[in-house]
């Protein structure tokens, strides 16, 4: 059993610790965060910007906690500027708790909030075409494959193709 909670000033230190602890793991497969993300003062400034975005309903940043209350990941919804009824889903699960079902549960919980609390009509999500585990998480939660964006991201000087999935309000 997990829970998700919106990021706040009070719990942002958990996000900072989580990101620092998992930095090398995430950077193996994702573009690196800016350097100031891992400096406490820089992170506080980034957090202030994110919380402003959250108050303005541009983003919804959630912490994922296990049954003991430990932060095991994060899951976010970013509103598309071109379509305010659509948000892009993104998530990260910590290396030491990977493959325990947390991502599937968190996606289920955030979709409930997205459609009922936040009022979105559609959620999109992208994964590297080789990231079959994340694709399974999305499919398990009712997403359908939409398209591939070729050469979408550059990670470690290699172009990565993105598989895009979407789900609409039931």
Question: What is each model feature region?
Answer:
Residues 27-48:
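Conserved GNAT-fold acetyl-CoA-binding loop/helix
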Residues 1-14, 18-28, 61-170:
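Acyl-donor (CoA/ACP) binding surface of acyl/acetyltransferases
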């Amino acid at each position: 059993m997990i829970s998700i909670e919106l990021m706040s000033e009070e719990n942002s230190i958990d996000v900072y610790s989580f990101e620092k602890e998992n930095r090398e793991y995430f950077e193996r497969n994702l573009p690196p965060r800016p350097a100031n993300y891992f400096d406490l003062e820089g992170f506080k400034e980034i957090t202030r910007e994110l919380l402003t975005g959250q108050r303005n309903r541009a983003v919804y940043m959630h912490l994922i906690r296990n049954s003991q209350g430990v932060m095991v990941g994060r899951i976010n919804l970013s509103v598309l500027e071109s379509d305010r009824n659509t948000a892009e889903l993104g998530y990260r699960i910590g290396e030491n708790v990977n493959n325990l079902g947390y991502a599937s549960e968190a996606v289920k919980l955030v979709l409930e909030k997205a459609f009922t609390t936040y009022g979105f009509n559609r959620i999109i999500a992208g994964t590297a075409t080789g990231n079959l585990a994340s694709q399974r998480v999305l499919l398990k939660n009712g997403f359908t494959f939409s398209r591939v964006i070729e050469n979408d991201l550059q990670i470690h000087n290699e172009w990565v193709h993105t598989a895009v999935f979407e789900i609409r309000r039931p």
